[in-house]
Amino acid sequence: RGLGDVYKRQRDFMIDKGFTYCIPPFMIRSDVVTGVMSFDEMDAMMYKIEGEDLYLIGTSEHSMIGKFKDQIVKEEELPITMTSYSPCFRKEVGAHGIEERGIYRVHQFEKQEMVVLCKPEEAMEWYDKMWSYTVELFRSLDIPVRTLECCSGDLADLKVKSCDVEAWSPRPVSYTHLTLPTN
């Protein structure tokens, strides 16, 4: 019970939505990461393993997407839907201040991820589904949530659309950033 039950419920929720559960590697090569984010973002966020071309993952999305590096996925195989639960490691702890973008910026944390590889013309439809699944999951855990669409100036490199999903928190008695579905 407790947190273990919450983790299991998250995983099972995504599997019930048709996602394939993956156990990602916790270290990733730079050529895989730079396929999904800019070098500047990688340098600011990720811990490099000294003497190796490896980084601790900042999110398991990169590992899941990296599985398809240098491959041609046939159109009839799409969409490919994947989910994982993993530890994440980030250098950006406290980088945004305690009240900005949530109070939970720490060096190591765990999170559930979902990734969809789809046809470009289906990308916005899948973005909407992923946002909907995110909200549905938190509400199924009796966590009050709201969403705020991000303006284009707040989007990271290589991103088209994103929204903050925030949860009600008794401390600091306001909504706090939880996750950021992105296309």
Language-model segments: which ranges?
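Secondary-structure transition/capping motifs at alpha-helix termini
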Residues: 12, 16-20, 74-76, 120-121, ...
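Active-site loop/lid in soluble adenylation, ligation, and acyl-transfer enzymes
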Residues: 1, 8-96
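Conserved small/polar residues in nucleotide/adenosyl-binding loops
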Residues: 2-10, 176-182
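Residues forming anionic-ligand binding surfaces in small-molecule and nucleic-acid pockets
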Residues: 1, 89-121
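A translation/RNA-centric and nucleic-acid-associated enzymatic feature enriched
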Residues: 70, 80, 84-104, 126, ...
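Short, solvent-exposed loop/turn segments at the edges of secondary structure
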Residues: 42, 51, 107-110, 160-162
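Active-site-proximal binding-pocket segments
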Residues: 112, 117-150
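Generic beta-strand/beta-sheet core signal
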Residues: 25, 57-59, 83-86, 112-117, ...
